């Protein structure tokens, strides 16, 4: 009898933990979607509401105010900034997304965002679309860490700020 009770208790705890993990993962997916949907509306406050107070974006700038500076600069430089989530994978406290990011260069960057290559650069008026991978780490239902891999050189080429790579026929 004792074995049966212990087994039932253990199964209940394990099932509860699995359900909690599933609930947390689903919640994290929803927060990630909200974060990028807010981005598409240039809704900085909506984005900041999804972050922990000490959230890190590549380690700096730290916290919500650091994110606010970055987001202000992105939306000034690219007022039509758009992120399309193409694919999302979530497990536990991590959500990874493959995205198409686009925008039109209409403002002057003031802080080193997007690899720092647009600081002080006059707007080209040109549109870009590149691929990004975003990895979000969550703590207590909020984004605590944001890592991204971007095609900054591809963006700069599309904006006309970096020459195209040499082709075999013209590289001699």
Give the label of every model feature segment.
Residues 19-172:
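C-terminal and inter-domain tail/linker signature
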Residues 4-14:
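Bacterial N-terminal signal peptides
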């Amino acid at each position: 009898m004792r074995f049966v009770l212990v087994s039932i208790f253990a199964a209940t705890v394990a099932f509860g933990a699995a359900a909690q993990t599933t609930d947390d993962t689903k919640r994290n997916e929803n927060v990630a979607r909200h974060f990028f949907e807010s981005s598409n509306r240039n809704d900085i406050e909506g984005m900041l509401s999804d972050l922990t107070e000490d959230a890190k974006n590549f380690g700096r700038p730290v916290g919500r105010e650091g994110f606010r500076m970055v987001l202000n600069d992105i939306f000034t430089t690219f007022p039509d900034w758009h992120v399309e989530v193409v694919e999302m994978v979530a497990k536990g406290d991590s959500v990874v997304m493959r995205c198409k990011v686009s925008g039109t260069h209409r403002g002057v960057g003031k802080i080193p965002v997007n690899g720092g290559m647009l600081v002080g650069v006059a707007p080209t008026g040109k549109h870009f679309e590149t691929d990004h991978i975003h990895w979000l780490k969550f703590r207590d239902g909020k984004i605590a860490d944001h890592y991204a891999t971007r095609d900054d050189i591809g963006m700069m080429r599309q904006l006309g700020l970096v020459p195209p790579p040499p082709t075999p026929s013209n590289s001699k």
